[in-house]
């Protein structure tokens, strides 16, 4: 099953579908020379934590909650969940792939989706 085609994101298979096709549950790490600035310019790489980080700021709690709801629904589809916290209008996010002990394409895909959901939540 392709995910989030209607939102224009890259397609991905769920972990269950990958297992059914004989693939490992452990996604491959992205290369060390990955161009974060070009791919996800609003995110900050944290090499020490093998993660990427971003703080989102919204007009109010309602927008922040809408953003988190959109992200949570997509995270469930992708079976890839952020480490995040919320304080009124701010949402702080760290993305990493724990099973791979570092950054994978799942993190980049989730970051791009979150950037889009932030814009959608502010409408």
Predicted regions: what is each one?
Residues 2-123:
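Charge-rich alpha-helical segments
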């Amino acid at each position: 099953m392709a995910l989030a085609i209607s939102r224009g994101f890259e397609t991905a298979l769920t972990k269950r579908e990958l297992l059914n096709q004989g693939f490992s549950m452990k996604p491959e790490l992205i290369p060390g020379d990955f161009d974060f600035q070009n791919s996800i310019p609003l995110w900050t790489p944290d090499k020490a934590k093998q993660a990427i980080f971003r703080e989102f700021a919204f007009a109010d709690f309602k927008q922040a909650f809408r953003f988190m709801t959109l992200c949570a629904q997509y995270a469930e589809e992708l079976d890839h969940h952020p480490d995040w916290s919320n304080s009124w209008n701010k949402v702080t996010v760290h993305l990493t792939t724990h099973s791979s002990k570092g950054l994978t394409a799942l993190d980049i895909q989730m970051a791009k989706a979150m950037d889009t959901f932030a814009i959608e939540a502010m409408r």
